[in-house]
C-alpha cells in the first residue's frame, strides 16, 4: 500500500509541476503595429470619414428649419435661391453670377425620390452628390428621374428613368442660367 501511495504521490507531484509550469508560461502577444502602420491606418480612416462628417454637419445646418428660413429647407424639399449670387455669397465656392441655384437634401433610405426636369431653352442641369461629395450623376435632359439606392427593388411609373446613387444621403444642386438678351 505504501508503494502505491508513493507512486500516486510522485505522479501527483509531477502533474502539479506540469500544471504550474503551464500556468506560468509566457503568453505570446500579437505583434504591435509600428508607428508608420498606425499612422497610415489613422490617415486612411480620416480621409474616408471626414467628408461624411462634414456632409452631415452641412445637411444638419441646411435642413434645420421649418421651411420659413431663407437659404434652408427641410429634407426632401427644395431651397430656391431668392437672388443671384454676388461677391458677398460665401456658401459655395465660386458660384456663377448668371445662374439661379436650387438645393435639396434627399433622404432615399426607404424609397426613391422622383425629380422632374422640364424642357427649357436655357442651360439647366441637376448635379447629384453622394455623402462623400462625389458627383454621382448629372441630369441634363428634360425628363422624370427616380433617384434611388442601388439595392432598391420596386416598380417605377412608365417614363421615369432610374438613377442610382451610392448613399442614402444625397444632395441635389440645380443650376439654371438666366436668359440671354
What does each model-found stretch correspond to?
Residues 174-180:
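Conserved small/polar residues in nucleotide/adenosyl-binding loops
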Amino acid at each position: 500500500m505504501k508503494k502505491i501511495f508513493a507512486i500516486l504521490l510522485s505522479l501527483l507531484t509531477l502533474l502539479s509541476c506540469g500544471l504550474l509550469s503551464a500556468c506560468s508560461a509566457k503568453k505570446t502577444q500579437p505583434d504591435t503595429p509600428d508607428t508608420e502602420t498606425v499612422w497610415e491606418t489613422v490617415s486612411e480612416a480620416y480621409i474616408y470619414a471626414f467628408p461624411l462628417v462634414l456632409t452631415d454637419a452641412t445637411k444638419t445646418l441646411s435642413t434645420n428649419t421649418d421651411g420659413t428660413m431663407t437659404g434652408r429647407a427641410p429634407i426632401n424639399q427644395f431651397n430656391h435661391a431668392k437672388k443671384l449670387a454676388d461677391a458677398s455669397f460665401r456658401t459655395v465656392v465660386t458660384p456663377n453670377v448668371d445662374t439661379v441655384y436650387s438645393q435639396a437634401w434627399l433622404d432615399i433610405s426607404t424609397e426613391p425620390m422622383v425629380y422632374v426636369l422640364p424642357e427649357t431653352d436655357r442651360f439647366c442641369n441637376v448635379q447629384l452628390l453622394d455623402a462623400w461629395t462625389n458627383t454621382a450623376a448629372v441630369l441634363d435632359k428634360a425628363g422624370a428621374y427616380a433617384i434611388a439606392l442601388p439595392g432598391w427593388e420596386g416598380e417605377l411609373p412608365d417614363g421615369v428613368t432610374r438613377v442610382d446613387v451610392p448613399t442614402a444621403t444625397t444632395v441635389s444642386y440645380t443650376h439654371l442660367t438666366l436668359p440671354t438678351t
